[in-house]
């Protein structure tokens, strides 16, 4: 999609996570509905909504990647940081799986992957000035990288305010 005739501009997004889920049927005699309830499905749904903001079509959790043998060598992945899970206060690593992107997107993500991930690591370590420099370099090669733009914005915001304590994550869920 997005490249097929009649689907220009359509950019589907997918969020993938791993965990237990409870399935059931709810409703009344007049109307029944199937429901999936779990933190896993809620996080996957959150990632799906988050994907376009970061130039991603497929966002996956580190928890899912741990379940797939050789995932890091089988797929084109770019670490985009952590999501802070408010229910547990844990940090979940999030990856952009760019195998589903256009050839042009795959090329610039592969080309800037090392610099981008270094910038993310610096941001997580609260080295905002150094992280900012990395994201500027990424944007010189790929100005359309929304994730790098978002991190640049976050670095600027952090540099222009007093340190508010440990952040180390991209977004809170």
Where are these regions (language model features)?
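Structural preference for long, well-ordered alpha-helical segments in enzyme cores
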Residues: 43-44
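Cytosolic regulatory/linker segments at or just downstream of nucleotide-handling modules
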Residues: 21, 52-125, 130, 136-137, ...
């Amino acid at each position: 999609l997005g490249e097929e005739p009649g689907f220009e501009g359509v950019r589907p997004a997918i969020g993938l996570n791993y965990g237990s889920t409870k399935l059931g049927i709810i409703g009344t005699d007049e109307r029944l509905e199937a429901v999936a309830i779990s933190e896993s499905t809620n996080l996957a749904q959150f990632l799906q909504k988050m994907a376009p903001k970061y130039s991603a079509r497929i966002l996956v959790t580190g928890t899912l990647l741990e379940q797939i043998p050789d995932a890091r060598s089988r797929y084109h992945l770019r670490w985009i940081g952590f999501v802070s899970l408010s229910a547990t206060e844990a940090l979940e690593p999030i990856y952009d799986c760019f195998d589903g992107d256009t050839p042009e997107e795959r090329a610039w993500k592969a080309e800037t992957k090392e610099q981008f991930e270094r910038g993310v690591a610096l941001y997580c370590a609260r080295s905002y000035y150094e992280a900012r420099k990395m994201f500027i370099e990424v944007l010189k090669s790929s100005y359309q990288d929304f994730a790098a733009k978002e991190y640049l914005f976050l670095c600027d915001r952090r540099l222009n305010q007093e340190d508010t304590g440990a952040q180390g994550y991209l977004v809170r869920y």
